[in-house]
Amino acid sequence: MKKTLSIAALLCGLCVCANAASMVTEWTGGAGPTEGNTYELGNAGNWSNGIPSRGNGQGPDVIFNNAGTVNVNGAMVDTSDGGGITVTGNSNVTVGGTRYTGNVTVGSGSTLNLGQVDFKSSDITLDGTLNLTVCGIDPGGNGARLVFGIGGIINVNQKIWGASSFSVSGLLATTSTDLTVGEFQFVTRTLVTSAGFDGGSISLGDFTAEDGSALAKASGLMEGNAADYQGQYYLYTENGDVKVQYVVAGAVPEPATATLSLLG
């Protein structure tokens, strides 16, 4: 069985101390929509533990799990200073009003849509899609770390300001059963799309294979025979985007699980 390293495990080795959240509350949608897929953020009936709120200078942890497609209408409080927003379980969530944002986690198959966001000492952990209109850094924090899982991407409509306070790292799927064993292929994946960078360049960090094995940084874009570059990747910026080129190797398909019939 193939071993896969989670981005949560990757983050664990990088974590920094942070304040605890003021509260934890999960979206239920129990009050029902006002129209179509639009719900009121300020209706306590839509939350498991009350409307998200700050306390003692700390932001809340706001969770959307298996929420479906929802447009949450209203002004979300700032989740910075210990809080954050988590979207998982194939949810497609649009939240208005939030600005000073703590941690963000978007799981595989899920999408989070936000407007203007100022990150503050934030871990942005992406296996899914994060769409932002405006994105920057609160100068009172310690920047933001973008940690990408196998399928994560962040799309920003405008320039990323305070870009030098962002760092990029994550996981790459370096094997595929779509290729035969002994076959190698270059893959280029887009991690960040934006209109450009203000305030310096994004810090380009380290990437790891999905099984946890180390990968080496290539000195430039790789060309020619992909087999000559096994275990390497090249992370770079291009016209406001962040991309990573890496090598995928053919893998043996996992055997089908045998099932014993009670009928013999």
Please provide the spans of the model-predicted regions.
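Short, threonine-centered small-residue motifs that mark membrane-proximal processing/anchoring sites
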Residues: 6, 17-22, 244-262
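Bacterial N-terminal signal peptides that target proteins for export
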Residues: 1-7
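Beta-strand repeat architectures
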Residues: 23, 48-157, 164-180
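Acidic glycine-/aspartate-rich tracts in secreted/extracellular proteins
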Residues: 31-34, 51, 68, 195-199
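Short hydrophobic/aromatic-rich beta-strand motifs
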Residues: 2, 25, 62-63, 85, ...
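Extracellular, surface-exposed repeat/solenoid domains
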Residues: 134, 139-245
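Right-handed parallel beta-helix/beta-solenoid
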Residues: 20-46
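Repetitive helical segments and hydrophobic/amphipathic motifs
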Residues: 11-12, 263
